[in-house]
Every structure is written in C-alpha cells, then in structure tokens.
Amino acid sequence: MTEEISGVIFGVWFLIGAALVFWMQAGFAMVEAGFTRAKNTGNILMKNLMDFCIGTVVFILIGFSLLLGEDVLGFIGKPGFDIFTSYKDFDWSNFVFNLVFCATTATIVSGAMAERTKFISYCVYSGVISALIYPIEAHWIWGGGWLSQIGFHDFAGSCAIHMVGGISALVGAAILGPRIGKFTKDKNGKITKVNAIPGHNITIGALGVFILWLGWYGFNGAAAKSVEQLGSIFVTTTIAPALATVVCMIFTWLKYGKPDVSMCLNASLAGLVAITAGCDVTDALGAIIIGSVAGLLVCFGVWFLDHVLRVDDPVGAVAVHMMNGIWGTIAVGLFATNSAPGYSIADSKGNELVGLFYGGGFKLLGLQLTGFVYVAAWTVVTITIVFLVIKATLGLRVSEEEEIVGLDPTEHGLPSAYAGFAIMDVSGDVMDVNENTDLGSSEYATASQAKKDAAVPVVNATTPASASGIHKVVIISKLTKYDKLRKAMNDLGVTGMTVTQVMGCGIQKGAGEKYRGAELDATLLPKVKVEVIVGKIPVEKVIETAKKTLYTGHIGDGKIFVYDVAQVVKVRTGEEGIEALQDVE
C-alpha cells in the first residue's frame, strides 16, 4: 500500500471515527435516561441534544481556535475565525473530530446533576465548558501546549475529556445538593441512611452502554496512523472494559450475594474510560490490569460518593469518568510499553519514555501525575466559579414541587416521555425533605385570617355520626404535599394509611400545555390519594389537619371525602370494630 493511499484511507477512517464519537451522544442519552426516573426522561434527552448543539455554536466561535489555534506561551491557542475567513484551506476534519470530543466532555456532567437542575442553567454551564474550560486544557495536551511539550501522554482523553467532565460533575452535584429522598436524616440533621432511587428502564441503560462501547472504537481508534496500531487499539479497547465488568460482577456477587446489573454496566464504561489515555501504548497484560482495577474502582467510587462525600450522582458519572479518568492517566506512567505499534512517547529532548513496570523508571509516571494535577486544578477552579455564579444569578436547582412532579412537565411542558404507554413515573419512594429543598413558608400560616376562616373550619352539624364510630377519610392532593401530609397525620396519631399515586384533574381540567405548537386537551396531573381509617381520633381533627396542611389558596389544593365504615375486621386476630384499629391509629 502506497503512503498516499494509506493517507486517504486513514483520513476517511478519521471522519468515520468522528461519526462514531458523535453517535456516543445517543449512548449517553440512553444511559442517563435509563438510570433516572421516567418523569425526567424528556429533560435528559433535551439536555443531551442541546449540549452538542450549543457546544457546536460556541466551538465555532471560540473553542476550536483556543484548542488548535497558534500556540501562545504553551497555555492557549490564538483566537481566530479561520472557519469564516479561510474556509477553503480550513482543517475541516480536525474541527469535526475535536467538536465531538468537546461535546462528550459537556454531556458527562448532565448525568450527575440529573433530575433537579434548571434547564437554562444546564445550557449556560454546558456552553462555558465547550467554549473555555475544555478547549484550554485540551490545548495543553493536544494543541501543542506545555503538557504535550514535556511528554505528557493522553491519546484519546482519559484526562482531557473524562476526568475533566467527571470533576465538573462532582463539583456541580456537590453544589447542587442531593435529590429529595436520597438521604434520610435524623432530628439533628445527621444522615442515617442512603436510599436507593432506581432508574426506570435498565434496558435503555444497557442499550446506551453498548452504543457507547461501539462508539469507543472510534473514540480511541480514530487517530491511529497504521493498521497495526489500529488493531492494537481495538484489542486494548476490548480487553479493558471486559475485565472491568467481570471483576465488578465477581465483587458485587461476593459483597451483595447477587451480581449487580447497573454496577456492571457502569464497570464496562469505567474500563473504557481507564484505557482511553493509554490505549495506543499498552499491551494486553497492561489492559487486563487497567481494566481490573477500573472494575473495583467504580464500585468503590459509587460507595464513596454515597457514604463518605454524601454526593448524589444518579448515573455514576463521577465514579466512571472522574475516578477512572484519573486512573487511566496515571496508568500510562505504569504500563506504557514501546512494544506497542507506533509508540511515540518522548520528553522535550526527544528521549523515549516508557512505563514504570516496563523498565522506564518514574519519569513518565511523574509527567502523568503533573498533567493530572494541573488539569484537575484548572477544572476545579473554573467550574466552581461557573456554578457559583449561576447559582447566585439564574439559580441551579428547580423548586421542590418541580423536582417531585418531574422536569418533563415543569421544564418542557411534556406530560410524559412515554405518552400512550404509561401515565407517568411518580416514584413510590417516600421523599424526605432535606436541607437543599426550598420549602418556603406554609401557605396556611401566611394566609389572611379571612381566607383561613373561609377554607379551614370543619362544619359537622349536618353529618350523622357513624353507627360503628369508624370513618374512612380519603384525601386527594398534589404529590408535592404528600410528605408534609404524612408527617401531619403521624403527629396527630394516625399512623396507618394507604397511599396510591394517581393521575387526575378536576373541573378545571389541569394546566393547558402545547405539543409541537398545538394545544393539548385536558392534562392529567400527578396526584396522591391517601386513605386513613379513624375511630378514636375525632374525624374533624383529621379533616382540619389535612386542610391546614394542603392549603395554598389556589386551584388544585385537593379534595377530602369522608365515609362511614360499617365494620372493620382484623384478619390476624379476628378483632372487630375499634379494637381492630388499635395498632393502626
């Protein structure tokens, strides 16, 4: 094969690889959607679409030139508009390839901050990552900047993309706070329990992992310069995630008694992230070790975030991308071997560098650690500033009601991403209020006395007493009021209740929404139906407590229905009447 033909073939493969990396956006969307709740699916899909589209706009305007423009002091590329002024001679292939890499960095953050982030805020910080944070540090590594000059090696982005995205995800999730119900606290505010909030569709999540794995062959292999090097990259890109998944399966099987499906899916991605930096310079043994460590590291990372840092990461983005991005970056300094095809790691003087375990000493390891520290520091400082500014201006987090109802209807006017298949995901988990939830003041407490008098008094003069002395009270209210209602009933002494999550609307037919510009008919809204049976506790007190708890003064506060109960029989003991309720009320 002549050099010219080889150049053409690999030029075409380079663009095919870019297309595969773009296809990874679909994989990220599926993983995030599957690992979160159905009521936020549309929001997840919209964010994964818009981070690429917004990223394209800002990458055209500034990001690409900062990354690959003429080097300025090893720190930054010279800003320019060659795509507009010199299109005929523009490096189109490099632009597309680096654009899809840039979009990957931004989309990693989405998963860790899912289900409680304002959409407008996501658009802003996603744009900043694509315009400034990623291009500048990527210039250090790939654009002729200072890290590339000293011999730092990150072939496809364990550091430049995954670690940066993972660090941004950690900082964002920490500032944002956990989802409602993720952590249970005692009266002193101390976290006593970590609650699982399962995703709604593991099938979609698994599909996303397979899409990402396929795309990773382009992610890691697109820049290969020979068939031999491409083949070696494909081998390491296959071995590492496979070993990571097997190790994770064994670990979770031993620890929990059964192999954990979602953790194994995360482990596959962790192995891919870890091998990305050194996929071109490691051999099969190195890939086995790198992948095996990644499989354990992702398990540790998920536990560490939940039980030590108390940071809520719904999809495991921090454990997968940050921790294994760091590991993959360091692993180059341990496992790089010059037996790999096309090996080209050298210091600023042109001296070849190899990994510690292959006789190269600590020099390459030191360079890799240096790169990790500086890129991590750059990312932490810049993204923290971005998130704090957004929090102080636009606000990062949606309201309590928006979070509980779901971001699909509240942020996008989409009643459900699964219209025609399911009414809505209104999770059955009890959602405890935490310090990151803005509850505001009680609407009843702040209402005028006239409104209180009109809304709350219970008139029972015309209601005949129940022959059995037992009443059934059915309360239908907004889902967002359930936690307060449950606590109010408990304080009153009513501990036995049946709770059903339902969809419905009153005469007002819910809030009108539009789909593709057309008006939707009556919108069914998520409601909660609470049924309690009371005997010794006066029914008037139950009604009054419920009304005070549910009152806002607006349409949709709910309804209370009271029924006579002829008889109650406890199946276990055969007790009847009031006695059958003694361990319920």
What are these regions (language model features)?
Residues 1-461:
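Glycine- and aromatic-enriched membrane alpha-helices
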Residues 410-417, 429-585:
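Positively charged, small/polar-rich N-terminal and surface patches that mediate targeting and assembly
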